[in-house]
């Protein structure tokens, strides 16, 4: 999903654009403790470069991250040299321990292709949950909330670098096809450009809820969330 160039500019761009990882982690911690007051451990699934995990660790102490991309994990290890980080697939990972909370942020579950894969992922989340624990998932847009043809454009200047990002998103079958272009300029490397295409599944709300239910979780959908796409919260039924 993410290659070296993406991982290199990922944090710089989103931090420069104003994404507040600390506030988001604090809000998720409050949500977790509203369901599980004694929560003391957390697993961050699809942790990326560790920007949320860094702040989750301040909230819980006992944390771990799971990430599929080795490039992202390389950056996460630099950011969090003492963190417990695993390379693995959210659909079938087995870590041999359980957590008070299992969370997946930034709509990472949208990269799953089918309801079967979504169900397998949520079942893996539930498999790693302590009795009385909580699962929190930030979804991608639903079919009825996705804005077909959406164009996003931002320029970020940070740490001597300038990053311009433009994207165009259209509906393709049951997915969002997002074409993303980055132009990066810095004094040492000059100007470079890269692009890629993301296919992000437009699962229905009911399909998320069915995955939670099949995993033995009682599920609630909360509107809003960090990016306006809401949050699914599940506790053992």
Swiss-Prot record:
Family per similarity comment: Belongs to the methyltransferase TylM1/DesVI family.
Lineage: superkingdom: Bacteria
Pathway in which this enzyme or protein is active: Antibiotic biosynthesis
Function noted in UniProt: S-adenosyl-L-methionine-dependent methyltransferase involved in the biosynthesis of desosamine, found in certain macrolide antibiotics such as erthyromycin, azithromycin, clarithromycin, and methymycin. Catalyzes the last step in the biosynthesis of dTDP-desosamine, i.e. the N,N-dimethylation of the 3-amino group of dTDP-3-amino-3,4,6-trideoxy-alpha-D-glucose.
Pfam family, one: Methyltransf_25
Record InterPro entries: Methyltransf_25, SAM-dependent_MTases_sf
Reactions the enzyme catalyzes: dTDP-3-amino-3,4,6-trideoxy-alpha-D-glucose + 2 S-adenosyl-L-methionine = dTDP-alpha-D-desosamine + 2 S-adenosyl-L-homocysteine + 2 H(+)
Subunit structure: Homodimer.
Record keywords, A-Z: Antibiotic biosynthesis, Methyltransferase, S-adenosyl-L-methionine, Transferase
Source organism of the structure: Streptomyces venezuelae
Lineage of origin: Bacteria, Bacillati, Actinomycetota, Actinomycetes, Kitasatosporales
Enzyme Commission code(s) on record: 2.1.1.234
Residues binding substrate: 14, 17, 145-147, 152, 165-169, 229
Disulphide connectivity of cysteines: none
PANTHER family documented for this protein: TRANS-ACONITATE 2-METHYLTRANSFERASE, TRANS-ACONITATE 2-METHYLTRANSFERASE-RELATED
Residues annotated to bind S-adenosyl-L-methionine: 21, 46, 67, 89-90, 105
Protein name (record): dTDP-3-amino-3,4,6-trideoxy-alpha-D-glucopyranose N,N-dimethyltransferase
Broad class of enzyme this protein falls into: transferase
GO BP annotations listed: antibiotic biosynthetic process; methylation
Signal peptide range: none
GO molecular function: protein homodimerization activity; S-adenosylmethionine-dependent methyltransferase activity
